[in-house]
Amino acid sequence: MAQIFNFSSGPAMLPAEVLKQAQQELRDWNGLGTSVMEVSHRGKEFIQVAEEAEKDFRDLLNVPSNYKVLFCHGGGRGQFAAVPLNILGDKTTADYVDAGYWAASAIKEAKKYCTPNVFDAKVTVDGLRAVKPMREWQLSDNAAYMHYCPNETIDGIAIDETPDFGKDVVVAADFSSTILSRPIDVSRYGVIYAGAQKNIGPAGLTIVIVREDLLGKANIACPSILDYSILNDNGSMFNTPPTFAWYLSGLVFKWLKANGGVAEMDKINQQKAELLYGVIDNSDFYRNDVAKANRSRMNVPFQLADSALDKLFLEESFAAGLHALKGHRVVGGMRASIYNAMPLEGVKALTDFMVEFERRHG
């Protein structure tokens, strides 16, 4: 079978070694003669999977002991509601920083539960899209928390600064597309959440890291399945969890640990991004309109100088084993998502194709 590199933004490419192990274990897991998808989530065998996954995840991100890790349903959009429902307490407003599509989506959902104080951080610098530095973010005095999205998959915009707003500011962040790609100081956040389908595992699982002093504040109308305290008290098993996604994510965590952990992923991700952006920047045929300080290392959107060639680019790249390069419908063009599971080899194959395509059509 020819090598395929999947540049999908999510569900995204998974490590080949993980898929191979899952394939080998699919019908006979742990010698039980059944699939992991068929065992009880409350049985000792799966409890071990769940406990190991949480431990490995904590190890990878150095999660402090005063933070709870929850394995949830609902995706990032579910957390757009869960955060205000759990963290507002008796307050009625929260600060929301708008830097792109997903931040705006979180704001739209939050309006159902509170009055967001929205700070538009988007700016244009020398004709390029950028984000105001955190020191310029205008936060209110009476907000229950501040929410932002460190990586915008559609816009290709990243906010790599570490929050430093003082101990009284509860920072909530949507890390769906950048979790585990670089070290983060978890202690600077009150809530971190991430849909699994980009850097963790299959779609259907969402991981929440929440500081324990924030538990117990849920709105009375908060659905039990979104209540952090209920999920924590029930070991993330208030109802039947997405067991296969949990199991496969656990395999990804072990793969990460075996391959140098988050620090090593950080180095490789930097190499991949530099290679791809280098080809774009050294060409008049391709362009990226994000300021270098805010370029995403996970999601690289780019446009061709002649959009009439877009269809041919996608057809030929697909035939070359470079899949899912079509840009999001909101922005068009191309987008290469190069999460942890994308090897440097895959990005090299893409850049080689781009250079050759430009030679023939530039």
From Swiss-Prot:
Cellular component aspect of the GO annotation: cytoplasm
EC main group: transferase
Protein name: Phosphoserine aminotransferase
Pfam families documented for this protein: Aminotran_5 (PF00266)
Subunit text: Homodimer.
Catalytic reactions of this protein: O-phospho-L-serine + 2-oxoglutarate = 3-phosphooxypyruvate + L-glutamate; 4-(phosphooxy)-L-threonine + 2-oxoglutarate = (R)-3-hydroxy-2-oxo-4-phosphooxybutanoate + L-glutamate
Family annotation (SUPFAM superfamilies): PLP-dependent transferases
Keyword Nucleotide-binding recorded: no
Record's function text: Catalyzes the reversible conversion of 3-phosphohydroxypyruvate to phosphoserine and of 3-hydroxy-2-oxo-4-phosphonooxybutanoate to phosphohydroxythreonine.
Subcellular location: Cytoplasm
Species annotation: Escherichia coli (strain 55989 / EAEC)
Molecular function via GO: O-phospho-L-serine:2-oxoglutarate aminotransferase activity; pyridoxal phosphate binding
Cofactor, how bound (note): Binds 1 pyridoxal phosphate per subunit.
Cited CDD domains: PSAT_like
Modification sites for N6-(pyridoxal phosphate)lysine: K198
GO BP: any one term: L-serine biosynthetic process
Protein residues bound to pyridoxal 5'-phosphate: G76, R77, W102, T153, D174, Q197, N239, T240
Cofactor: pyridoxal 5'-phosphate
Disulfide bonds: none
Pathway: Amino-acid biosynthesis; L-serine biosynthesis; L-serine from 3-phospho-D-glycerate: step 2/3; Cofactor biosynthesis; pyridoxine 5'-phosphate biosynthesis; pyridoxine 5'-phosphate from D-erythrose 4-phosphate: step 3/5
InterPro entries named in the record: Aminotrans_V_dom (IPR000192), Aminotrans_V_PyrdxlP_BS (IPR020578), Pser_aminoTfrase (IPR022278), PyrdxlP-dep_Trfase (IPR015424), PyrdxlP-dep_Trfase_major (IPR015421), PyrdxlP-dep_Trfase_small (IPR015422)
Residues where L-glutamate binds: S9, R42
Family assignment from sequence similarity: Belongs to the class-V pyridoxal-phosphate-dependent aminotransferase family. SerC subfamily.
